[in-house]
């Protein structure tokens, strides 16, 4: 299925980007002619990595996976960013029913703000459905192995983050 001549936005904080995000990105690319990964600077959400590093990690991971997508950081309303990018589709990944409740509400609000922009929900693949950036950061913080969830370069950034947080 290809939504002809469509630009899609896959937004997130990507703090950090995980294999779950990459799974959605790969699948989203099949649905639109152009995919923009919007790295959000959300003032209401604490992030461990700054916007430049999150954007850089996303660019490296997407390029390393051989995915053709643009990575752009943004702040403010998602639908405003989508409109600025001439996107007509917002793509959101869903891991669990709890994600759906929140995402469904957000899609309704976005529709009310800009009805010309649709939201598409992609369920996480079976092997990525329980990966979250929060879980990955917690596992790394506690010294666990996160190699099943993120790339080696992201693992290195998590190690650096933990060193900084521990005053090393």
Swiss-Prot record:
Catalytic activity: (R)-4'-phosphopantetheine + ATP + H(+) = 3'-dephospho-CoA + diphosphate
Gene Ontology CC annotations of this record: cytoplasm
Enzyme Commission numbers on file: 2.7.7.3
Disulfides per UniProt: none
UniProt-recorded Gene Ontology molecular function terms: ATP binding; pantetheine-phosphate adenylyltransferase activity
Superkingdom assignment: Bacteria
CDD domains tied to this protein: PPAT
Keyword Nucleotide-binding: yes
Pfam families: CTP_transf_like
Binding site for ATP: 13-14, 21, 93-95, 103, 128-134
Protein function: Reversibly transfers an adenylyl group from ATP to 4'-phosphopantetheine, yielding dephospho-CoA (dPCoA) and pyrophosphate.
Protein family per UniProt: Belongs to the bacterial CoaD family.
Subunit relationships: Homohexamer.
Protein name per UniProt: Phosphopantetheine adenylyltransferase
């Amino acid at each position: 299925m290809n939504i002809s001549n469509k630009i899609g936005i896959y937004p997130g904080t990507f703090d950090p980007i995980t294999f779950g995000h990459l799974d959605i990105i790969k699948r989203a690319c099949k649905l639109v002619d152009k995919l923009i990964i919007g790295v959000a600077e959300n003032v209401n959400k604490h992030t461990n990595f700054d916007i430049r590093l999150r954007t850089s990690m996303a660019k490296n991971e997407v390029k390393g996976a051989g995915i053709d997508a643009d990575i752009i950081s943004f702040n403010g309303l998602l639908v405003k960013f989508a409109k600025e990018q001439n996107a007509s589709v917002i793509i959101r990944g869903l891991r669990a029913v709890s994600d759906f409740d929140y995402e469904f509400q957000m899609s309704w609000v976005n529709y009310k703000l800009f009805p010309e922009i649709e939201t598409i929900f992609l369920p996480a693949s079976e092997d990525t459905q329980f990966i979250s950036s929060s879980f990955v950061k917690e596992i790394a913080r506690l010294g666990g192995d996160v190699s099943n969830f993120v790339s080696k370069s992201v693992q290195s950034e998590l190690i650096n983050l933990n060193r900084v947080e521990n005053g090393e």
